[in-house]
Amino acid sequence: MIDPILHGMRRILLAGTLAALAAAAVAAPPAPATAPTPAESAGRVAKAQKDADQFALISGRGSAQVCKAGFESLRRGALRGNAVDQLTLGALYLHGRVCGRFHLARDDHKASLYLAHAAIQGRLLAMPALAELDVRRGRALEANVWALAYLHYAVPKQQNTGCPASLLHRTLGMLSAAQNKQIVRDANAFILRYNAGIEAALHQQAQPPTACRPRPVGAHSRVPLLQPFSRIHIVAMHRALVLYLVAYDRDGRVQKLATVFAEPRWRDARRLRQIAEQRRVSAAPACDTALRWAFLPVELDNHKYRISHRG
């Protein structure tokens, strides 16, 4: 069940780090030490079908029946409290999705609910999306609280450029001095209320990966902007973040890739997609699944803004 307390916290629990989280949202099953039982084999077949249905929905390439099946499996998982499914479904509601004749309409309210629940369960990639959603809705207070929460949990802790700096730059000017103090109080209240659960989830995500789980090489990808005279520079002059769902083979190469969300919606993500397609992960020759799924965030950042703290 969706926690009803979030309905009453729209100012604090808003409707909006990155770093080493690419492997944190992986849903690949662990490799068994012995031959699988018939029930385990059937479970793997069902999971592979579910993954294929969800990928069809996210990529927008599939029949209406397949895409609806992908949506229903995401919805069931999200309502059961699966944070990865909540993150994915919330991201899809951000802008809606068309897949064959299946249309998932944009729904800011559902996006905020699912993403907020994913965030408080340690899926920090939900925080930039929630902040961007609140920017779109004209809710500068809420957007800033999500940006501060993102900054608080960012990895490494010293990351004061990129997404949080950009979000704060774009919204702080909309607030009065009193409101600036209020967002700090609200962010602290959010952290105090949910920190134990978030830290526990982050600790679990940091545990040694299983044999089948993709392990990224290095931090998340950042791409320099084009030259200042380019129209793309104007469109994405602050920052762009694209979250991909990627299927890696046993050798660690990308076999399938689909965009979960792009914030802000960048008009030409070709360069970011190339970066994602070239990304390799750890090989797993002994893995009993042909494809290993993972979220991969790719950030475009021109380092235009940096957060400085004045005593």
Q: Language-model features: where?
A:
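Bacterial N-terminal signal peptides that target proteins for export
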Residues: I2-G16
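Structural signature of tandem alpha-helical TPR/SEL1-like repeats
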Residues: S63-E72, G100-L113, R139-W146
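Charge-biased low-complexity segments
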Residues: A31, G43, A48, R76, ...
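Helix-start (N-cap) detector for alpha-helical repeat units in TPR-like alpha-solenoids
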Residues: A83-Q86, L124-A126
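N-terminal leader/linker segments that initiate helical-solenoid repeat arrays
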Residues: A27-K68, E72
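Hydrophobic face of amphipathic alpha-helices that form TPR/SEL1-like repeat modules
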Residues: D53-G60, T88-V98, M127-R136, A165-H169
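Bacterial N-terminal signal peptides
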Residues: A15-A24
